[in-house]
Amino acid sequence: MKRVLSVLVVLMLVLSVSAIAMAETVEEALTAAASMSNEELYEKAKEEIAAGGQLNFYSTTSFAEKAASNFMEDYPELASKVVYAEIDDGETYTILTSTIGSGVKDAADMALVQNGPDLKTYLLDEGLSYSYFPESMKDVVDEANQNPPVITFINSLLIYHNGNGSINLTNVWQLTEPEWKGKVFFKDPTKETVNLNFLMMLTSPDWSVRLEKAYEDYYGAPFQSNEFKNAGYAWIDGFLKNVNYTYTSASKIATGIASGAPGNLGLFVFSKLRKVDEADRVNLTVVQFENEVEGFSGFMYPVYATVANDTECPYTCALFINYLLTEAGFGGEKSWNSNQGYYSPNKTILKPEDLQDEPYEYWSTRLVFEDLHYIDENYAEAYEFIAVRVG
């Protein structure tokens, strides 16, 4: 009898070790999910939910909550099992790095985050989260937007109070002139990472060359300086000298300019116009809709999806990301696509014709785009330069 029990114990240990060896890691599951159909992923997701799983996801953009609601309607057996929590950009990576793998209840299974350089540094490079992108979408999303996967682009534009008529802004170097002192509203870049990343991109070779051209067009002479490394640094210096930091959020900048002094201008998130009282919206003009601007008309930044390395529902995460990359997940009433200032990386998803906006392709040549690799490699020098001038 003892021998039989010993054999059974050994067999159980062998089976247990085999089960562990056969257990699929999150990374392996996401790799497998990339080539599956949505129907196959749904079956896998139902298995995860039946086993007690729940997809908790954090997002820096509130429209993700509506997308999650639509997702559960389209996949009814996942109803109430996709739980949204809004997270502020400034605390995103502090929360995620401290909770992923900690066993904290309702920690994120996936997140929609901005600030690509921090995503790379604190999560992806550390193996705390993984990128996932479906093979079925590779023909409609540019390769540059697949790893890490972009869910939406958001733009910030130059917008002004038109109470005194046009400000005739045709060149970004105008904003470095003394006449703009205190009249340009911009959120403190040391407290708003996408604003910081925008300024850092201006120091890159491509953008400094573009600013050199704008400089020569405006001043009638080539850019020359012994003080600044390139035209990007020079523009940042002049611009920040004029910035007014009274307002601490994009929504407050939008409403403050709309109800404030004519002639004031802000560089803020375009979609925040929805926060402005309807009676005041007539006071606001998007510079780019009035005329072309030498240099740029604002900037564009991505929101990425990333999957936590300890999620118990990787297939559900994959299905949800697939959904967000489609018209069903990105569009509809009260969605990203029904509002100004949000653009899908899926080139087949177009902005509604009745919306005062332009497609992604239009903005792609007029806005400064975030390059997470350039920022990651040049962060220290550019940050010090900017922080000193913010004061």
List each model region and its residues.
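Conserved C-terminal helix/tail region of periplasmic/extracytoplasmic solute-binding proteins
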Residues: 24-34, 39, 361-391
